[in-house]
Amino acid sequence: MNSECILTLDVGNGVVIQDVQLWGNSVETQLPKKGKARVVAHIDTRKLPLWARTRGLFTCFSSSSTTAAYFRAKLLKDRHAHRGIVAELDKLYLVFFRKEQSPSSFQIECIRLNLALKRKFDTQLLQASTVSSQPTMSPHIDEIVAKQSLARAESSLRISRHVQLADYRRQFSSTASSCILGGLRLRGIRESEADYHKIYKMTYSAIEFAFRSELSNASPPISFEQVQETVETLLKVFTRS
């Protein structure tokens, strides 16, 4: 068994794992000696046709504990028994999957997808479609991968937007609460008084309503002075005797 290729693997969210070594016995692997691959999708290996597999089978090794932990988390759980991790490397596609062993002694193997044969089938289907009134074509695997990558990117953007809104609202809430409590203290209204909590809630609800447009869009930035001025105006109304 010879070392065929050493990879770094971008697994998403800015995380890159190191020293993914692919070892095999192939005479011609058609893999670079070194490269940077990128995870693009997860697949069910049971649905991977035999013609998509090349003859070469690689065994993965690594001296990195982080790399081992990644594959253990992604491939060794019971629910991931048939999961394959698809990675793109210089317009080639690799599939990482686990070999059936005990969790304490696991082994990760890798194959290169044979897309040449897939494209040959697609060409034959295209030619046959000229005879059929309703042509049937199966999509290229790279098109499927591209769609999955786009879906993942859109999901990441939605999560990022949600986090941005939550942070914006949390900062506003902290500032508003601080201004309201300070305003109540300046007016000599103690927490033990009957109207203390009622005034606080009314003021907080009113200031949220006043800045509802900014809170729904997380923009533009709301300054401390804006919040304090609005709170003072509201407290003058709510504490007027």
UniProtKB/Swiss-Prot annotation:
Chief location: nucleus
Cytoplasm is among the record's keywords: yes
GO biological process: DNA replication
GO cellular component, one term: cytoplasm
Subcellular compartments: Nucleus; Cytoplasm, Cytoskeleton, Spindle pole
Family annotation (Pfam families): Sld7_C, Sld7_N
Protein origin, superkingdom: Eukaryota
Keywords linked to the UniProt accession: Cell cycle, Cytoplasm, Cytoskeleton, DNA replication, Nucleus
Biological role stated in the UniProt entry: Required for the proper initiation of DNA replication. Required for mitochondrial morphology.
Family listed: Belongs to the SLD7 family.
Name used for this protein in its record: Mitochondrial morphogenesis protein SLD7
